[in-house]
């Protein structure tokens, strides 16, 4: 293994020197295996089973053979490349579809076949079937992983511990329907007899990112006089600013916490309850039963919900086989249903169900989430690409990058395999992004001309929800231009001719050429839907969920736990009393002691 990468590094450095590139770029890229080994050494014995697979070794040799080929050269050899390296899914609704073009990547038929073989050798399909069948694929917590059951519109039986879970799923969905229709119609009244016009969702992580993203994305389908707010940060500013915007007599607070013990969520919930009670008392209004009229819970802890004052009739359940970052399809999506209504929420579920069926039944080479994942494996593990940009060219999707950041990084940000050995390769990428065209004026410079290869997912719509002049054509012209520019680039001779035409000459031209040259061959996927409807959004999210599954299965990690978020939370619980006391501390490391003591001596809380 080490000999292979040493030779490969030498080969690429020599090649890039010939092509005029900086050798250090190639050197940095191919130090990746050594970095993985160094960082995971403390975790114990390395699990090298992935590296020994025939398909993995085949991909290593194919990278050495084709890694320096330009993407454009593939198009020159194959005029049907776009058709052969794209996949379209019918969403079974009007003219809507979901389309993936992955032709602008360093992929040819040999590489594609090897990637497909890798998925087969790693048992991806068997793992996916086990998840769909309700087996306990979350190995470290011994739990099933069944977000697919939440959008199982076929109602096929899904058995967990001998019980079909679909009855419970449908009962909660019916409960959500009844509640949201009462609120949306004005039937539900607050303490002073007024209807509800403000919804404040209090949650964090998956209890916040999903509902925020979906309500923003589906705003054209929302009830416009019902205003949704989201409070997640334990920073009191977040709650304070929301409370300034709502009339408490017309507000319902949704407390989203499975255990009803989450520190950030319960802190915010108690502040909201205190604000309501203070308001009512200050205005001479009875507080009896007020919490039950202005608070509902998304939880499984009946006792804690009752203690808080919430009527347990208005407690919406979900189950331990629903992970937080996969929970927007569950009762956690109550704020979404309040915003867009029951029928549109069912459409949202249906879009995901269509993608589930496609993923479960379609051969790998025509399977959209599979190929999206395999292209990502190719760049992450063979090109050394550590990041993934998500670039939605639709303003309604402006929160999608943050949502996918949690989905991907919390799921696959793991350094240990399910066999409890240290991983031998890079796992989950760093995910970031911004709505187009804003990102073009922020970080695209690095994507085009920086020293890192950053695979990009461009996401756009054929139809716009808002026909304003030529705005949509202008937006999509940028979408298509950016994907082309990343691939094609601009060579030195093209730059020289442009500079001559501009009136520049001599050394000035030669000095400027390197600054205006684009190497090209920067990879991108293009993902299109006809229109951003609830069904289309459901399909997009499910596509990325299954992409995460495929990559996690190949890396041999558990994509469904999140132990990495625990340590800091535990330490925070021990530090909080120290901040409340204001005393000088000495039981942490030198830096942490210094920070706490500086805070305690200067804070005036």
Curated annotation (Swiss-Prot):
Reaction it catalyzes: alpha-D-glucose 6-phosphate = beta-D-fructose 6-phosphate
A Gene Ontology molecular function term of the record: carbohydrate derivative binding
Disulfide bonds: none
Pfam families: PGI
Record Gene3D superfamilies: 1.10.1390.10, Glucose-6-phosphate isomerase like protein, domain 1 (3.40.50.10490)
Subcellular location: Cytoplasm
Keywords: Cytoplasm, Gluconeogenesis, Glycolysis, Isomerase
Enzyme class: isomerase
Oxidoreductase among keywords: no
GO biological process: gluconeogenesis; glucose 6-phosphate metabolic process; glycolytic process
Active-site residues, Swiss-Prot/TrEMBL: 410 (proton donor), 441, 569
Pathway: Carbohydrate degradation; glycolysis; D-glyceraldehyde 3-phosphate and glycerone phosphate from D-glucose: step 2/4
Presence of the UniProt keyword Isomerase in the record: yes
GO CC aspect terms: cytosol
The enzyme's E.C. designation: 5.3.1.9
Family: Belongs to the GPI family.
Protein name, as recorded: Glucose-6-phosphate isomerase
Lineage, opening ranks: Eukaryota, Discoba, Euglenozoa, Kinetoplastea, Metakinetoplastina
């Amino acid at each position: 293994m080490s000999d292979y990468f040493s030779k490969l590094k030498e080969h690429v450095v020599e090649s890039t020197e010939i092509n005029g590139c900086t050798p250090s770029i190639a050197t940095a890229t191919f130090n990746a295996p050594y970095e993985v080994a160094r960082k995971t050494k403390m975790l114990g014995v390395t699990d090298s089973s992935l590296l020994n697979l025939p398909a993995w070794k085949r991909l290593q040799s194919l990278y050495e053979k084709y890694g320096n080929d330009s993407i454009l050269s593939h198009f020159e050899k194959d005029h049907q490349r776009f058709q052969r390296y794209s996949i379209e899914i019918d969403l079974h609704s009007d003219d809507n579809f979901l389309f993936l073009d992955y032709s602008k990547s360093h992929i040819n038929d040999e590489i594609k076949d090897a990637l497909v073989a890798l998925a087969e050798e790693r048992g991806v399909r068997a793992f996916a079937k086990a998840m769909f069948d309700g087996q306990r694929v979350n190995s470290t917590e011994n739990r099933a992983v069944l977000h697919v059951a939440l959008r199982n519109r076929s109602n096929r039986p899904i058995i967990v511990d001998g019980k079909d879970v679909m009855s419970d799923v449908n009962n909660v969905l019916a409960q959500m329907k009844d509640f949201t229709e009462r609120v949306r119609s004005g039937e539900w009244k607050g303490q002073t007899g007024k209807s509800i016009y403000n919804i404040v969702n209090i949650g964090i992580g998956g209890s916040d990112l999903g509902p925020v993203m979906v309500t923003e994305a589906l705003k054209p389908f929302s009830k416009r006089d019902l205003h949704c707010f989201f409070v997640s940060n334990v920073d009191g500013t977040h709650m304070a600013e929301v409370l300034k915007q709502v009339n408490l007599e017309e507000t319902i607070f949704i407390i989203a916490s499975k255990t009803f013990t989450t520190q950030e969520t319960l802190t915010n919930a108690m502040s909201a309850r205190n604000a309501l009670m203070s308001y009512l008392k200050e205005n001479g209004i009875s507080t009896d039963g007020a919490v039950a009229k202005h608070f509902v819970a998304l939880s499984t802890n009946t006792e804690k919900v009752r203690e808080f004052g919430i009527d347990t009739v208005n407690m919406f359940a979900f189950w331990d086989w629903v992970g937080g970052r996969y929970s927007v399809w569950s009762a956690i999506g109550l704020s979404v249903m309040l915003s867009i209504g029951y029928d549109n929420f069912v459409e949202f579920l249906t879009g995901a169900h269509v993608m589930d069926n496609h993923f479960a039944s379609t051969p790998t080479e025509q399977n959209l989430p599979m190929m999206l994942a395999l292209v990502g494996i190719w760049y992450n593990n063979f090109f050394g690409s550590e990041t993934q940009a998500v670039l939605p060219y639709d303003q309604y999707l402006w929160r999608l990058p943050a949502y996918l950041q949690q989905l991907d990084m919390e799921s696959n940000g793991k350094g240990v395999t399910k066999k409890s050995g240290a991983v031998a390769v890079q796992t989950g990428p760093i995910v970031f992004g911004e709505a187009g065209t804003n990102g073009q004026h922020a970080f695209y410079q690095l994507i085009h001309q920086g020293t890192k290869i950053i695979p990009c997912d461009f996401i756009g719509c054929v139809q716009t929800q808002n026909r304003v002049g030529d705005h949509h054509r202008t937006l999509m012209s940028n979408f298509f231009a950016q994907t082309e520019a990343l691939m094609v680039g601009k060579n030195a001779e093209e730059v020289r001719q442009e500079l001559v035409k501009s009136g520049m000459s001599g050394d000035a031209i030669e000095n400027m050429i390197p600054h205006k040259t684009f190497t090209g061959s920067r990879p991108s996927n293009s993902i299109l839907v006809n229109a951003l409807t609830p069904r289309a959004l459901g399909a997009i999210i499910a596509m990325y969920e299954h992409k995460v599954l495929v990559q996690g299965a190949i890396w041999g990690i558990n994509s469904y736990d999140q132990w990495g978020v625990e340590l800091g939370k535990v330490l925070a619980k021990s530090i909080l009393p120290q901040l409340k006391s204001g005393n000088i501390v000495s039981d942490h490391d030198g830096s942490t002691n210094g920070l706490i003591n500086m805070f305690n001596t200067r804070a005036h809380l």
